[in-house]
Amino acid sequence: MKRCVPLEPQAEAVCQASSKPPLIFELPVAQGRMVLEEAQDSPVYKYPARAKRVVVNTGRWGAIPVYLVEPETVCTPANVILYIHGAGWVFGSYHTHEKLVRELAARTGSLLIFPEYSRSPEVRYPTAIEQCYSVMCMVPELVRNMGYTANPDTFTVAGDSVGGNMATALTLMSKFRRGPEIQKQLLYYPVTNACFNKGSY
């Protein structure tokens, strides 16, 4: 049974405007990325937080930008969230997710680490997930460089859509490889099934 969820008028207006063809996945990759980036340019409230961009070497998987987001108030020892962005493995960036991750950091008092992994079609599986795993293994060092000590009892992996898929995969990889101990998952509408004809889709 389908359930209708009422939206705020502003959200409904965005949905209506973005439902007109061509849809983002129907555009050439570069154009689709530009459309998504520009959609996030409108002025909106962003929670107070400092963001620092660093470049992290993930070994054979290459160097990638990683954003370290620090809210005004941080718990001690620091709760840490590793956030993996969604948008189909093809789109998405720190810019498209900045409002969300700043709010998540500010409202939880957590340090947030955001790897801007290499996207398809420029790279193929397993590059993106291995890059994220490498960054996850570097979390204690990244947090120390921010002047904090990470709280191992609250380490959280989070993500939206395919980012939720990757956060789930990171949890399994870490278990099988005996890597960092993940305590919590925060998954926003994660991709857990590729079937488009199921009720959950």
Question: Predicted regions: what is each one?
Answer:
Residues 141-158:
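Gly/Ser-rich "nucleophile elbow"/oxyanion-hole loop immediately N-terminal to the catalytic nucleophile
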Residues 77-88:
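Short beta-strand element of the alpha/beta-hydrolase
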Residues 116-120:
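Short beta-to-alpha linker loops that shape the active-site pocket of alpha/beta-hydrolase fold enzymes
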Residues 159, 163, 167:
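Gly/Ala-rich beta-loop-alpha elbow adjacent to hydrolase catalytic centers
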Residues 95-114:
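Short amphipathic alpha-helix adjacent to the substrate-entry channel of hydrolases
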Residues 1-71:
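A glycine/proline-hinged amphipathic helix-loop "lid/cap" segment
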